[in-house]
Amino acid sequence: MSQWGPRAILVQTDSTNRNADGDWQAAVAIRGGGVVQLNMVNKRAVDFTPAECGDSEWAVGRVSLGLRMAMPRDFCAIIHAPAVSGPGPHVMLGLVDSGYRGTVLAVVVAPNGTRGFAPGALRVDVTFLDIRATPPTLTEPSSLHRFPQLAPSPLAGLREDPWLDGALATAGGAVALPARRRGGSLVYAGELTQVTTEHGDCVHEAPAFLPKREEDAGFDILIHRAVTVPANGATVIQPSLRVLRAADGPEACYVLGRSSLNARGLLVMPTRWPSGHACAFVVCNLTGVPVTLQAGSKVAQLLVAGTHALPWIPPDNIHEDGAFRAYPRGVPDATATPRDPPILVFTNEFDADAPPSKRGAGGFGSTGI
């Protein structure tokens, strides 16, 4: 795509595809701060074939947007609901990596029994964002520095989450820990092991934030112990005791869901991770059966972008009830400092014009869950 410049994004819609009229209408919009969007609406009836949802009021399924994209490696696309929309189907927030070359699918949640959408019923925004390749700066677990004498032995038979009880007893009384409990269903999903160093015994925490590959938009968030999310319920997951340090530049960290889990009816409430706090996010189970996320699963992803990149995602968005009541919709930010927007280049020769990528058309869990 070098012929169009380093900020060019190649786009093919089903309407620009040769000899095809397409099911979707797409319009380009530039929002506050130079943020570029595609605003899409279905102009024909769209079939909806949800996955088995059991005893649930909701049906979850994928809908093709008839859209393919090729972005520079420092860009990603966010699939989300528009700022203003009616009480119809819910479009779950999704993240598209720069290396994805397949047709973009939106995860849609609708009342159980829905099998299609009338023309104009589905409205989807695609927002293009600059992203940062630098991982966030985290503290060590508090126990390493403040409580080395309290490192729990894996064989001590202690409570399942000894570090999340809010206090541990010492010879001098109770000592408060910075890990916060949000409601009764917070689950610490990290892994702590006792290690011996030249400075004495301390606790090591297994990495919860995996290195980012070149074409990835976000850093995968890993859990080290199984977590069960109840049927039609929600669980708050804290993957690590590490605290986010204040960024030196205009950056913010956002916790977003994974497409593969969204499509199974497991929705991560998008949340901005504020500095000075440990990471925590809500997983909502819209199915009628309990779902267990196995140890070693990638359950969310961490996106590092500009402070004003996603202003409509609230910080510390911990709500254990009403997956949609507080689910954020896109809101343009009119106060951000303007910057040079990317250039959208529409083509009907996508396969010939798009540069090759390692990921190709693999998506929805193709890189592991």
Curated annotation (Swiss-Prot):
<feature type="binding site">
    <location>
        <begin position="364"/>
        <end position="365"/>
    </location>
    <ligand>
        <name>substrate</name>
    </ligand>
</feature>
<comment type="similarity">
    <text>Belongs to the dUTPase family.</text>
</comment>
<feature type="binding site">
    <location>
        <begin position="258"/>
        <end position="260"/>
    </location>
    <ligand>
        <name>substrate</name>
    </ligand>
</feature>
<dbReference type="InterPro" id="IPR036157">
    <property type="entry name" value="dUTPase-like_sf"/>
</dbReference>
<keyword id="KW-0378">Hydrolase</keyword>
<dbReference type="GO" id="GO:0046080">
    <property type="term" value="P:dUTP metabolic process"/>
</dbReference>
<dbReference type="InterPro" id="IPR034745">
    <property type="entry name" value="HSV_DUT"/>
</dbReference>
<dbReference type="GO" id="GO:0046872">
    <property type="term" value="F:metal ion binding"/>
</dbReference>
<dbReference type="InterPro" id="IPR029054">
    <property type="entry name" value="dUTPase-like"/>
</dbReference>
<dbReference type="Pfam" id="PF00692">
    <property type="entry name" value="dUTPase"/>
</dbReference>
<dbReference type="GO" id="GO:0004170">
    <property type="term" value="F:dUTP diphosphatase activity"/>
</dbReference>
<keyword id="KW-0479">Metal-binding</keyword>
<keyword id="KW-0546">Nucleotide metabolism</keyword>
<comment type="function">
    <text>Involved in nucleotide metabolism: produces dUMP, the immediate precursor of thymidine nucleotides and decreases the intracellular concentration of dUTP to avoid uracil incorporation into viral DNA.</text>
</comment>
<keyword id="KW-0460">Magnesium</keyword>
<protein>
    <recommendedName>
        <fullName>Deoxyuridine 5'-triphosphate nucleotidohydrolase</fullName>
        <ecNumber>3.6.1.23</ecNumber>
    </recommendedName>
</protein>
